[in-house]
């Protein structure tokens, strides 16, 4: 039976912000890597309409709102959205929230968004190409789509094994990657870097940035840290800009 990621995240949230992203003052892209303050992929978001796909616990959405954005969040897990609402109220910012699949954006008009962001959520989506088409539809001409996702090379490893660098599966195996998170079973859809790039191009995005961030070399480690982070990229970070209509 396929894993129900939405139900799992409803249980994981436990009424509090969840996920892999720390902090609420700056946009973060993944565990134990630098964030927007270093990568500078978004530009100024002040007075911009910004849509986050898979807003999770709301840390990035609140950070965007604090910087003056009209922050719009979409998530498939109602319990996560409830946690986002509480976090936004606590921080004294306003956010707009929607519940539904990340591949469906009926609440957004065409050419109405200045920026779309997604951090570690697109792996849960089965039809990634539909997400790309929907994002292209709602973005303004030339506007950026910035997203991070689990790096497909890291999917090959079992980082809880005695030998975490032992390859456990083929890079070309498209079956979902199943794993445990806070006691719940989750799954990510595995795609190669080439497939992600080709999907963006078919959806009429011009890709100008692909990053495989190295982990932070100093400072505290998150609870998600694994030693293989030092040798195999954990996160794939991409920016594309809308071209055409």
Predicted segment positions?
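A short glycine-rich, Lys/Arg-flanked "PGG" loop and its adjoining helix->strand segment in the class I
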Residues: 129-144
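Short alpha-helix
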Residues: 186-210
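Acceptor-substrate binding/catalytic loop of class I
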Residues: 149, 153, 180-195
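A short acidic, Gly/Pro-enriched loop at the edge of an enzyme's catalytic core
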Residues: 107-115
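A short SAM/SAH-binding and catalytic strip from SAM-dependent methyltransferases
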Residues: 114-129
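Class I SAM-dependent methyltransferase SAM/SAH-binding core
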Residues: 49-53, 57-104
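Conserved class I S-adenosyl-L-methionine
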Residues: 1-46, 59-63, 87, 144-176
């Amino acid at each position: 039976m396929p894993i129900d990621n939405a139900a799992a995240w409803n249980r994981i949230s436990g009424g509090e912000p969840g996920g892999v992203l720390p902090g609420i003052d700056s946009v973060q892209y993944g565990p134990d890597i630098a964030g927007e303050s270093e990568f500078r992929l978004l530009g100024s978001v002040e007075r911009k309409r910004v849509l986050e796909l898979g807003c999770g616990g709301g840390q990035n959405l609140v950070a965007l709102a604090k910087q003056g954005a009209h922050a719009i969040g979409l998530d498939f897990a109602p319990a996560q959205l409830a946690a986002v609402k509480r976090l936004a109220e606590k921080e004294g910012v306003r956010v707009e929230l929607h519940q539904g699949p990340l591949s469906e954006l009926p609440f957004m008009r065409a050419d109405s968004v200045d920026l779309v962001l997604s951090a570690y959520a697109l792996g849960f989506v089965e039809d990634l190409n539909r997400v790309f088409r929907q994002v292209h539809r709602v973005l303004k001409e030339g506007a950026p789509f910035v997203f991070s996702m689990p790096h497909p090379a890291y999917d090959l490893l079992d980082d809880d094994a005695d030998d975490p660098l032992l390859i456990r599966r083929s890079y070309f195996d498209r079956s979902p990657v199943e794993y445990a998170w806070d006691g719940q079973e989750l799954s990510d859809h595995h795609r190669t870097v080439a497939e992600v790039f080709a999907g963006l191009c078919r959806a009429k995005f011009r890709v100008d940035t692909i990053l495989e961030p190295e982990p932070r070399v100093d400072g505290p480690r998150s609870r998600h840290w694994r030693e293989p982070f030092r040798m195999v990229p954990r996160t794939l970070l991409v920016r594309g800009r809308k071209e055409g209509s």
